[in-house]
């Protein structure tokens, strides 16, 4: 059984991941962690995922040191300013489920990945990855003097723009195969 704490537990993605994890037999959600100052610290996660789960929301990553893996759904600023050094100290595997990192942030994360296993997944949608594979296929088939434009629209509460939904297609499609790939968010 995998023991994992979940950071960013009170957000949209965090709540969804947490609910799915809680309904699996092979995963034990060991902690629900929110950022310091979050008004839900001290509350129970049942407020977000249903009443059958009894786990308090805490705000201290270091309390969760006996976990097997961290899943972070916070945001780039919280990750880099508050959590990065704590993950480095904990030395545990890490899933980063947020976007909007700067180039400098990505370099720091790459450095951290030399010491601990890291998986970055800024988008958990199977549809996006199917879209990327389809895009790769068509990019190889089209004439090289054709421009491709991908326009991304989000709800008005989107906090991490540009999101991986817009970044991933251009990053995954080889630019050698593309004359121009323009992503607009």
Predicted regions mapped to residue ranges:
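Rossmann-fold NAD(P)-binding glycine/threonine-rich loop
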Residues: 77-90, 97-120, 126-138
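Extreme N-terminal starter segment of soluble prokaryotic enzymes
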Residues: 1-5
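Rossmann-like NAD(P)-binding element
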Residues: 61-81, 92-93
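C-terminal substrate-binding/catalytic lobe of Rossmann-fold NAD(P)-dependent oxidoreductases
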Residues: 7, 12-64, 143-185
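Structural detector of well-ordered beta-strand residues that form the stable sheet scaffold
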Residues: 30, 58, 95, 117-119
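Short, ordered loop/turn segments at secondary-structure junctions
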Residues: 35, 99-101, 123-124, 153-155
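Short, surface-exposed loop/turn motifs that are enriched in glycine and acidic residues
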Residues: 120-128, 155-162
């Amino acid at each position: 059984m995998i023991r994992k704490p979940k950071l960013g537990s009170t957000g949209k993605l965090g709540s969804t991941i947490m609910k799915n994890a809680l309904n699996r037999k092979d995963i034990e959600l060991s902690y629900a962690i929110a950022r310091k100052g979050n008004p839900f610290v001290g509350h129970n996660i049942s407020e977000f995922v249903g009443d059958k789960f009894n786990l308090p929301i805490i705000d201290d990553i270091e309390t969760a040191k006996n976990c097997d893996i961290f899943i972070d759904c916070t945001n780039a600023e919280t990750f880099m300013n508050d959590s990065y050094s704590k993950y480095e100290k904990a030395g545990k595997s890490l899933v980063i489920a947020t976007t909007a990192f700067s180039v400098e942030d990505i370099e720091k994360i790459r450095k951290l990945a030399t010491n601990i296993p890291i998986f970055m997944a800024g988008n958990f949608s199977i549809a996006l990855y199917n879209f990327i594979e389809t895009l790769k296929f068509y990019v190889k088939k089209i004439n090289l003097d054709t421009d491709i434009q991908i326009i991304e629209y989000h709800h008005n509460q989107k906090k991490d723009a540009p999101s991986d939904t817009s970044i991933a297609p251009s990053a995954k499609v080889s630019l050698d195969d593309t004359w121009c790939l323009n992503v607009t968010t």
